[in-house]
Structure formats: structure tokens, C-alpha cells
């Protein structure tokens, strides 16, 4: 089972990925399902009409702006980080929060989600992280709390949000 770092806790993932179930059909009725953007675009209306929570998985080669029409219907956007040299996802987090006004969960997923990037991803608007199997949960949690003072402005973190990330 996938491990998710969220709100200073490591949790079992409550979301399923499209294709994990045998059928993988639009009308599967599963409560929380993440589908690739390409799959969502095959029949957007059917996916948006399905019961339960819907998330989309965004590859580095796909445009964040292409989500603008469906974003109000999504609960989660999972941004892929397939390799260490791929940094577009950092910008995707900021674009989702600042330009598109997405208030749902933004999750960093992929092999390159490592403890050295978690704090920086949080500053770019990410609020959950899928930990690769080789990552140690306690070290990932420590990485999120590593700095309590920053010198450059980024994602505005105020009030209860600040307490959540820096407590």
C-alpha cells in the first residue's frame, strides 16, 4: 500500500489509481479514484458524473492550464515527479494554487519525491506526498519540519496553515 505524508502524519493512501481495480470502468463507484489526465479527457462528462471523489494525475508533459475547466470538480491533483531532473512539478503547484485558485489537495507522486524536496514542495503549494518505498517515513517527516524560518516569500502560509506545516 502506498504511504502518504500529509499533515505531519504518514497515512495509508485512501485513493485508488485508475487501473488498479480489475475493470477500471467509469461507473465503478469507488469513492476516491485518481485517473490520468488522458483518461479523463476520453470522456470528461462521464468521469465528472461518477459518484465519489475524483482526482487527476498530471504528467510533466501535460499542461496545468488544461485542467481549468474540470478543476472545480476535482478533490485532488497528483503531480508526477518521475526523475530527479524533472522540476516542472514545482511550478505546477504554484500555478494550481496561485493562478487557478485550486483549494483541494495537491500531491507530489513519483520516484523523485525524496526527503530533500518535501519542504520545498510544501512551499510551492503541495500538501501531500507519496513516499517511494525506499524513503524512510521518519526522515521524510523531519524534512518537512526542517526549517521554521525562510528568507524568501513563497506560498503564503498563515494562521492555522502555518501551524500545520511548521508545528
Show where each model-derived region lies.
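Short Lys/Arg-enriched alpha/beta "domain-start" segment
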Residues: 2-20
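C-terminal helical cap(s) of enzyme catalytic domains, especially alpha/beta-barrels
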Residues: 138-167
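Catalytic cores of alpha/beta
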Residues: 64-69, 113-131
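Short beta-strand/loop segments at the ligand-binding rim of alpha/beta enzyme cores
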Residues: 49-56, 95-109
